[in-house]
Amino acid sequence: MTQRFKQLETAAQGTREATRDLLDAARWNDAGLIPAIAQQHDSGEVLMMAWMNRAALEETLATGRVCYWSRSRGKPWRKGESSGQVQQLVTAHLDCDGDTLLLGVDQQGPACHTGRRSCFYVALGADTAHVDSAPLVDPHELYGER
């Protein structure tokens, strides 16, 4: 944990910091990325986890449209760019250690590339796991043939 986040542990509600300074103090991984959890702002439903670099986060904060960093493509991934399933930013929070983001979003349609609302659809039990939701949309309709 950086000193800046250590100081925030005892900060009074309403304390203000420059976003730039907090992003400087955030704990980005060796690839310059930070995990970002997307949560539906009004229901609390956890939709997905993706990665952001600083440029993607700054774009998201500036435009209100969520942009992640695609590790597989090595470029910005503006959510909904190819599928139309856009995420609009409502809130953004850094956790107490400055190493994870929580994005409150307004998700239009499914968040998952499988066509499901959430990427978290495989429920684990001690002995068995099961799929607990069906796709809302056929992925081929979202993206065409892959």
From Swiss-Prot:
* GO terms (BP aspect): L-histidine biosynthetic process
Has UniProt tagged this entry with the keyword Phosphoprotein? no
Q: Which cofactor(s) does the record list?
A: Mg(2+); Zn(2+)
The GO molecular function terms of this record are: magnesium ion binding; phosphoribosyl-AMP cyclohydrolase activity; zinc ion binding
Q: Which pathway does UniProt place it in?
A: Amino-acid biosynthesis; L-histidine biosynthesis; L-histidine from 5-phospho-alpha-D-ribose 1-diphosphate: step 3/9
The record lists the catalysed reaction(s) as:
1-(5-phospho-beta-D-ribosyl)-5'-AMP + H2O = 1-(5-phospho-beta-D-ribosyl)-5-[(5-phospho-beta-D-ribosylamino)methylideneamino]imidazole-4-carboxamide
Assigned GO CC terms? cytoplasm
The record's free-text note on cofactor binding: Binds 1 Mg(2+) ion per subunit. Binds 1 zinc ion per subunit.
Checking Gene3D superfamilies in the record gives: Phosphoribosyl-AMP cyclohydrolase
Tell me the keywords, alphabetical order. Answer: Amino-acid biosynthesis, Cytoplasm, Histidine biosynthesis, Hydrolase, Magnesium, Metal-binding, Zinc
Residue positions annotated to bind Zn(2+) are: C96, C112, C119
Q: Which residues bind Mg(2+)?
A: D95, D97, D99
Q: What class of enzyme is it?
A: hydrolase
Instruction: Tell me its EC number(s), please.
Output: 3.5.4.19
| InterPro entries named in the record | PRA-CH (IPR026660), PRib_AMP_CycHydrolase_dom (IPR002496), PRib_AMP_CycHydrolase_sf (IPR038019)
Q: Where in the cell is it found?
A: Cytoplasm
Its biological function? Catalyzes the hydrolysis of the adenine ring of phosphoribosyl-AMP.
Q: Which family does it belong to?
A: Belongs to the PRA-CH family.
Q: How does it assemble?
A: Homodimer.
- The protein, known as: Phosphoribosyl-AMP cyclohydrolase
Q: Which gene encodes it?
A: hisI
